[in-house]
């Protein structure tokens, strides 16, 4: 297990003290985000189905935590320091145990920018082996979004990358005290940085953005890889899935199959469009439209998905 050295935290934690304290002061009057216990010791806050635009406030992803007998694991920390602070405050309403791990399911900004709230000597950050690089590559872009939509200056858009890294198709088990969780990394799918977290005690899987319920699924990696990863997840022995966006469900196979069917339809219709020399804009206007009534934010996201996969599939 890789851990930060003590002087690392002295160096990097101290500059955060003022920022974290100041942020708590700013947002002290804000309503706390709410959590639901979806299985014993598993708490989830469900983000809103909003786009990253003028309506964005850093709270669109599902975030939460798992409580063991000795410690706690945070699963995704939200889209801002504000959300991270509210998550940290909410945890203390349910347990006084220390947070031992913060796990990021992937690189997207709505899942990672609360990490700084949990920096401490005994906290390890866990993620995909590609996550540190991906975070660094997107840093400036994310800072612009946080400044424009959240009014967060760059010195408060703090990235904390994982120090425990998991390679694709491998997993590691972490014990929270009579409660083991398994973190599994995948090859490119939703992104190049996807991991899932399985609570072995309750057979609950945190899928991150490998599963969307209600909201239109997002492809920021590879559509073929996404379809393949869903096939792997469908083979798991689990009872419940917590998606990255949308309502946790015990009808998890139906949820994954619905998502996979959308991807297969989109893949086939985009391939047909390319074979017929149809241009990108016409394909955006037509492909996948039979799915439009099944998903929220479809008119926004379906076109983005096509814009992502069309040029990739042209080279196949």
Where are these regions (language model features)?
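N-terminal secretory signal peptides that target proteins for export/translocation
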Residues: 1-10
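Bacterial N-terminal signal peptides
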Residues: 13-24
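Metallo-beta-lactamase
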Residues: 30-38, 133-186, 191-192, 200-201, ...
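Conserved beta-strand hairpin/beta-sheet module of binuclear metal-dependent hydrolase folds
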Residues: 40-90, 195-207
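Active-site neighborhood of phospho(di)ester-bond hydrolases with catalytic His/Asp-centered motifs
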Residues: 75-77, 100-108, 126-129, 186, ...
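Active-site HxH/HxHxD metal-binding segment of metal-dependent hydrolases
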Residues: 89-169
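Divalent-metal (often Zn2+) His-rich catalytic cores of metallo-beta-lactamase-fold enzymes
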Residues: 198, 227-278
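C-terminal regulatory/interaction regions
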Residues: 275-316
